[in-house]
């Protein structure tokens, strides 16, 4: 994977390691990753490494490695991350009580205290990390408590990811499922908290809000769901199988295998299945919405097909309408302030 992508890359290339749990491969695997990146980087390409983890195995060695190689967790892991400049996404789902109700070991033991220790280690070793929080019903209902708790921990880089129902299952039937009205209220409450801190110059970085403000300033958002169009990426399984997105790792979307196919063959298959093109098929009601210029229809994974029109509409459409109606004026105020600086 590294050899083929390095030979083709221009300017920069990004490798993101997710799971399962990627730290189960051990530090030796990631040391080999860094070695290969150096070996095949013949043209001074900028390499960005990222790793998403539950933090359970992070120690000092890991933290140091991640910091140096731009990754991000125990002391051994931390040393590795710091040394190799890994950017880490650390999964934390709210306060201890909420987190442990969902994220526990296979024998039911809590994990929160160990994850918080991993965050402390990464901070100590200078590892860059973001907090990744899945927004389920409990998180959405307790966001004020969670926001204040994160501030006390010094967790100032945050991403909130709406909890998804399993693909091809009906929406809202699982106990953790996030319903549109609930998600809309969550976004409004979180923005109110963020905006109050922004007025004081003490706001955390919340990617979703920062991207919206960037859109209003004329910048392309970094998150593909906020662009409304799927990007071109290769998600690779351990056996080399390639898919267009980590939400669509199914046989119907398989693009090929890195052990058997060239990158141009993988790209041809992507075009054949029309994956990126399908993200452009938005319902007319969506395209004419007053908020389309900032919403862009959201992530393809959250869209439902309208059988009558053959186009798609986002399940969380009403959530975003609630949010923008309540918060867009203050976003525009923020933009005016930034433009004056």
Predicted regions and their residues:
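Flexible mid-to-C-terminal extensions adjoining Fe-S/redox cofactors in radical SAM and related proteins
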Residues: 249-341
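Radical SAM/AdoMet-radical enzyme domain recognition
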Residues: 2-18, 25-163
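Radical SAM enzyme [4Fe-4S]-AdoMet core and its adjacent flexible, acidic
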Residues: 100-113, 120, 124-229, 235, ...
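Generic recognition of stable, solvent-exposed alpha-helical segments in well-folded globular domains
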Residues: 28, 61, 76, 114-117, ...
């Amino acid at each position: 994977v590294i050899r083929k992508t390095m030979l083709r890359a221009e300017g920069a290339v990004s490798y993101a390691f997710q799971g399962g749990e990627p730290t189960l491969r051990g530090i030796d695997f990631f040391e080999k990753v860094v070695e290969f990146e150096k070996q095949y980087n013949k043209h001074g390409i900028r390499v960005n490494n990222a790793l998403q983890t539950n933090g359970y195995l992070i120690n000092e060695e890991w933290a140091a490695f991640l910091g140096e190689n731009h990754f991000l967790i125990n002391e051994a892991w931390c040393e590795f991350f710091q040394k190799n400049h890994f950017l880490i996404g650390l999964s934390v789902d709210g306060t201890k009580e909420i987190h442990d109700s969902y994220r526990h070991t296979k024998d039911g033991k809590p994990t929160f205290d160990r994850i918080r220790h991993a965050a402390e280690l990464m901070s100590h070793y200078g590892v860059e990390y973001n907090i990744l929080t899945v927004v389920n019903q409990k998180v959405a209902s307790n966001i004020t408590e969670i926001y204040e708790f994160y501030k006390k921990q010094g967790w100032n880089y945050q991403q909130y990811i709406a909890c998804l129902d399993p693909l091809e299952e009906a929406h809202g039937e699982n106990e953790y499922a996030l319903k549109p009205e609930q998600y809309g209220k969550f976004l409004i409450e979180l923005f109110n908290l963020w905006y109050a801190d922004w007025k004081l110059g003490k706001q955390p970085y919340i990617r979703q809000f920062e991207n919206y403000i960037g859109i209003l300033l004329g910048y392309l958002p970094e998150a593909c769901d906020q662009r409304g169009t799927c990007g071109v990426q290769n998600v690779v399984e351990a056996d080399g199988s390639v898919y267009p997105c980590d939400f669509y790792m199914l046989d119907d979307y398989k693009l090929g295998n890195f052990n058997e196919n060239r990158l141009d063959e993988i790209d041809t298959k992507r075009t054949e299945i029309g994956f990126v093109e399908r993200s452009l098929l938005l319902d007319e009601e969506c395209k004419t919405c007053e908020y389309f210029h900032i919403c862009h229809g959201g992530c393809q994974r959250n869209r439902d097909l309208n059988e009558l029109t053959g186009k798609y509409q986002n399940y969380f459409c009403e959530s975003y309408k609630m949010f923008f109606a309540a918060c867009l004026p203050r976003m525009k105020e923020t933009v005016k302030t930034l433009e004056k600086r």
